[in-house]
Amino acid sequence: MRRAGRSRQFSSVEEAFSTSAARPGRRGRRSGRENTAKFVPATLSASTSFSRIEGISSRSVTLASPGSRSGSGPRSGPRLGPANRSTSRYRWVPAAAGWTVGVIATVSLLGSVSPLIRYLIKVPREFINDYLFNFPDTSIAWSFVLALLAAALTARKRIAWLLLLGNMILAAALNVADIAAGDNTAAEIFGENLGFAVHIVAIVLLVLAYREFWAKVRKGALVKAAAVLVAGDVVGILVSWGLVELFPGTLARQDRLPYVVNRVVGFALADPDLFTGRPHVFLNAIFGLFGALALIMATIVLFQSQRAENALTGEDESAIRGLLELYGKNDSLGYFATRRDKSVVFAQSGRAAITYRVEIGVCLASGDPIGDPRAWPQAVDAWLGLCQTYGWAPGVMGASTQGARTYREAGLNALELGDEAILRTSEFKLSGPDMRGVRQAVTRARRAGLTVRIRRHRDISPEAMADTIARADAWRDTQTERGFSMALGRLGDPADGDCLLVEAIDRDGSVVAMLSLVPWGTTGVSLDLMRRSPSSPNGTIELMVSELALNAESLGITRISLNFAMFRSAFEQGAQLGAGPVARLWRGLLLFFSRWWQLETLYRSNMKYQPDWVPRYACYEDARLIPRVGVASVIAEGFLVLPFSRRDKVHTGHHPAVPARLAQSGLLHHDGSAPDVSGLRPERTDAEEARSRLPEQVRVRLAKLKVLQRNGVDAYPVGCPPSHTVAQALDADDQQDITVAGRILRIRDFGGVLFAQLRDWSGEMQVLLDNSRLERGRTADFTAAIDLGDLVEVSGQMGFSKKGTRSLIVTDWRMIGKCLRPLPNKWKGLTDPEARVRTRYVDLAVNPESRELIAARSEVLRSVRQTLFAKGFIEVETPILQQIHGGATARPFVTHINTYDMDLFLRIAPELYLKRLCVGGVERVFELGRAFRNEGVDFSHNPEFTLLEAYQAHADYRVWIDGCRELIQNAAQAAHGEQTVLRPGADGRLQPVDISGIWAVKTVHDAVSEALGEQVDPGTSLSTLRKLSDAARIPYRAHWDAGAVVLELYEHLVEDRTEEPTFYVDFPTSVSPLTRPHRSRPGVAERWDLVAWGVELATAYSELTDPVEQRRRLQEQSLLAAGGDPEAMELDEDFLQAMEYAMPPTGGLGMGVDRLVMLITGRSIRETLPFPLAKPH
């Protein structure tokens, strides 16, 4: 919804929410929450508006910079990393002053509480107090003031510099006055001169180091803090006055009230000699304690008011929610940025923000920046500028890998903090040995009668939500709600309607446990709150998590972020077998601390769900700051609770941090609800930035497209069939009206006459545009709108140009497709083979040879089908996804079906399913389809290929010798008009080779014998074959039998050297598991391979129909698979059961159609496939 009361109206959502980063801003002292309104952005664009790294080791301590960031824009302001600190020669002054005052504060405190220390330091304390610096004997209040001053000096606070400088000037003036009095002893004169010299040196150094004290103090409730201080001092004075009246000691009555005021309020700065007498010694410490308590309370109130005054405003939260809607898809902790006790700083562009909290001088950022990742560096710069402005030490808790890299680029270092547990709901299941513990816990909870209810917060009534909040408070095991970077800290807020509540309900209908989860983008949830009743049964949490994961699809959830496990890798590595002593010691130390902080419990409670572990990092500026950042994190997360601390659940901020233009847009809501960002498209890059990266010709064409659109021309209209193809138009009568459509390849402009070359699938023709013949517009309009590559539709009549070229005389034309990228060279086309593969569409558009190859492939496929149909075969389709990989020996591709939670294989061959059809009585059957083998890619292999398998009942492998030859010869006839194939000639050009007639047939063993010059037959021993292989330098494996060695010899010595098409028959039985043994020759199977010019084209079997023998052979294959052979076939019980119903004697053929096309066209497989697999860039 939009809110009324805007200061102005914007024409679009994009205009209001976008902010230009073109005007570089200054960071430094102008970059902070209080100064964000001073940024004046330029004109806005839709894509820079309110509009998302890799390679970090989970154990890395320092993240390497990946280099430049595309589109991030220039950094504004100086870097604040350790290497970019002040280089002034006085940069040491703040630390030295802080340490000096801090030492005095520490000694003063010890002296105030210990009489022994007070006695030991009496002489130096009196000298310092008299001549150098205020150092009363006992004043806890003064010690606290000095401690605050020391901390402020170290943090380079300007106000601390001013106070210390004023103190030094006043002390120097007092020394001058004492020296001028002239009634001092020699010791006093020495002390006064020494003190004056020290004061002058300190004053000079402070003045020279003025620029080193740049830090400001945040706005806070000074009046409220002063009131608390006055009230505390008044109470302290009254109580102290009463005590001194009860225990006056020797203190005179008229001096008692002034003495108390000096000790409680005046920090005992007045000389004790001014008062008559002394009270009891123990009262001085009590009086100073009262003063210190008043100061402490006032300081806490001031700090709390600073945090509350500068916390999220409603507009800030509304802007953050808008950024989350546009860019929060990948940040599981992003929603926690809406926590209202945090502060926020925005990038100058308004496209990113960082939420943070200040504890003990550490500005602790909460996780990753929110918003557009391209604007993250700007947000980090603004945040570091804020730290510099107020003298805070920067720190980050819970950054992701991408976020940690961004912080690293800004000068911080990163340390692995732990891992976040992410459940992928599509992969979650209760089955399997790894989930046994969860499965048993869920079973126990269900037996106890528990059920689970899942609702969105918006669907819960106010009364029910009140009960939920009461239960959450009652079941909390701590006094306060914990959390900072990974907790929301509130329940029942109307703005959190998308949050998810999961409840466990017992048999009586009572809620016994609950989970509250915040949105993570649109398809995820992130755990915020987990509570359970002490009376809930074991397994309650496991039941809720499991039910949420198992029912996630109905809720539109694909991922769940569970708890965060600190030091997960240390627990895991230290428990591994063979872990080193350091890993075991570190794990033991963590186990010890787990007694109090549940480190191991959180790890194990997440690990049982088998989640994905995503590392999270802590970032810091300097290693010396790690302890301080750690303590600040402990305080922020609520493990260390400071007095009077509170965590606000409502908006307390009064200083909006959103950029002024965004705040004035009227789109942000004061109640913190999300703005209307439906008109924004976050996935789009900045238009100007994107256009600047495009080639010039593309930008020119885009500009023409915009001109056409402005003129009302649809550059991509609805299709209308042309009356003629180009080929038909060239043969048409001159008086016939003709409409053709195609792509413009060339344009020649002669002023009033224009010639263009137009191509469609059937061919090319010249079109002639003459101003005198055009019915609408002029040739200039054509040249202004049309570029090479554009698709146009032209109408007219056929005629001739002056040079006698047959042309279409155009009377009308229209654009039917604007080409935004230029075509390759009009004469050479695409010459790079890799480019032709990757941009096949361009190759087809400009290269006639590529079109001819596509057409030839189509003719081959059609011929194969027609030949088989003519023989009475029927075509079928069998499953491509198979549960068992079989039918051939090859490595399969593996995928997974979530519904049945099982692996499936892309088929390597359709053979086993086709044979099932043969069992069923389909006597002549074939399939022409895709098969997949996870093997090499080269000139003749592609992982995805077209395979023909055909089976003919009552036939054998000899029948398919003639059948296969006929298939190939018919295909060549269809492609070339004659039974020829193309082969490279002596000059490298393709020449036709006749393949008509009968082809040669040889046995495998005879062919191997010819190649070796030694006789080899099925009875040749394995040892002899090995010797022959060694002599021929053919490698083999030790576990191969004689058949495998013969096959290896055949592949190297015969197949690779074959030229003319040849059938090699009778392969060894051991390498043909699905083939019947030869009817008359033992040791070989009835199988042949067709080889031509070194490439295997087809294979055929007399199929093995004996189910007993088939089972034995497949069992042998399954043993090989179990032994680790990835290519061996698995045992398919369903296929074997089908074979037991008897399959008729059958001859089977398998042919690689891609290789057939290669043979006929003389091209490689990459050239003949429309889209071969190409290695990614």
UniProtKB/Swiss-Prot annotation:
TM segment ranges: 93-113, 135-155, 159-179, 189-209, 227-247, 281-301
Entry keywords, A to Z: Aminoacyl-tRNA synthetase, Antibiotic resistance, ATP-binding, Cell membrane, Ligase, Lipid metabolism, Magnesium, Membrane, Metal-binding, Multifunctional enzyme, Nucleotide-binding, Transferase, Transmembrane, Transmembrane helix, Virulence
Location within or outside the cell: Cell membrane
Matches recorded under Pfam families: LPG_synthase_C (PF09924), tRNA-synt_2 (PF00152), tRNA-synt_2_TM (PF16995), tRNA_anti-codon (PF01336)
Topology within the bilayer: Multi-pass membrane protein
Gene name linked to the record: lysX
Residue positions binding Mg(2+) 2: E1096
Chain intervals for the UniProt region annotation (Phosphatidylglycerol lysyltransferase): 1-676
Cofactor note: Binds 3 Mg(2+) ions per subunit.
Catalysed transformations (reactions): tRNA(Lys) + L-lysine + ATP = L-lysyl-tRNA(Lys) + AMP + diphosphate; L-lysyl-tRNA(Lys) + a 1,2-diacyl-sn-glycero-3-phospho-(1'-sn-glycerol) = a 1,2-diacyl-sn-glycero-3-phospho-1'-(3'-O-L-lysyl)-sn-glycerol + tRNA(Lys)
Region (Lysine--tRNA ligase): 677-1177
Record has Aminoacyl-tRNA synthetase as a keyword: yes
Compositional bias per record (Polar residues), positions renumbered to this chain: 8-21
Record: residues binding Mg(2+) 1: D1089, E1096
EC identifiers of the protein: 6.1.1.6, 2.3.2.3
Feature: compositional bias, Basic and acidic residues: 681-693
Molecular function terms from GO: ATP binding; lysine-tRNA ligase activity; magnesium ion binding; phosphatidylglycerol lysyltransferase activity; tRNA binding
Compositional bias ranges of the Low complexity kind: 65-82
GO cellular component: cytosol; plasma membrane
Cofactor: Mg(2+)
Any single GO BP term: response to antibiotic
Protein name: Lysylphosphatidylglycerol biosynthesis bifunctional protein LysX
